[in-house]
A protein has these predicted regions:
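Hydrophobic/small residue at the entry helix of a nucleotide-binding pocket
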Residues: 89
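HTH-adjacent hinge/linker in prokaryotic transcriptional regulators
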Residues: 26, 30, 35-78
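NAD(P)-binding Rossmann-fold cofactor-contacting core
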Residues: 100-122
Length: 219
């Protein structure tokens, strides 16, 4: 699947979940298009990549589609996670309740700062990095979340790779490239913010150009 399609799947899942909670039982691609601001043809094309899910002229069963996309996203089972880095971002992620509702269960949080050892963040106690490997093995950790400086991210990722971890959600300011067996999602929060400022700048430039055109037409 293309990266664009993979990026749309969580949006489909989120919107369908809201429709299900609102008691909507069936929806057409046109109706979903109006809600999500994605063309109806794109929606049908996306769903056809996974078998279609609906019938022409009949639409989609919301609950069924929600469950099937959840399976594609791997949300039909729970995932055990750890956070490495107990700073502001790590603590914010640990405190975010919605992860648990999606089946993402935080089992531990680690840091190399002795001042944080033993600190409780929700029901997690900050542990030293020396205990990382043992904890990962004993608790069958699937995913590690890195909220640490980029200087130490690669070393920590390689330590995790040796423990047969399945995936890394990386917030460190470095793109990690590990073996094919380990899935890595590199997240740069500033990238999203820069996309926003690009769109603001493009909109403002468009207004400036249209104002200049109107001015020239008036003189």
């Amino acid at each position: 699947c293309s990266s664009d399609l993979i990026g749309r799947l969580p949006r489909y899942f989120r919107y369908l979940g809201e429709l299900k909670d609102d008691g909507i039982e069936r929806i057409s691609s046109q109706e979903l298009s109006a809600i999500m601001k994605v063309t109806a043809s794109q929606i049908r094309q996306d769903f056809n990549n996974f078998g279609g899910f609906g019938q022409q002229g009949y639409g989609y069963k919301v609950e069924y589609l929600y469950e099937e996309i959840g399976k594609i996203l791997g949300l039909h089972k729970t995932h055990n996670l750890i956070i490495i880095g107990a700073g502001n971002l790590g603590q914010a992620l640990a405190n975010y309740m919605n992860f648990e509702r999606r089946g993402f269960l935080f089992r531990g949080i680690f840091d190399n700062n002795p001042a944080l050892f033993g600190k409780r963040i929700r029901d997690l106690e900050v542990q030293p990095m020396e205990e990382l490997e043992t904890f990962v093995k004993e608790n069958e950790i699937d995913i590690a979340v890195l909220t640490i400086p980029k200087d130490s991210a690669l070393e920590v990722a390689e330590r995790l790779a040796r423990q047969d971890i399945k995936g890394i959600w990386n917030f460190a300011h470095i793109d990690l490239n590990l073996s094919k067996e380990i899935q890595v999602e590199n997240v740069h929060l500033s990238d999203s913010l820069m996309k926003l400022t690009y769109n603001i700048n493009r909109y403002e430039n468009g207004l400036s150009k249209s104002s200049a055109i109107r001015y020239r037409l008036c003189i």
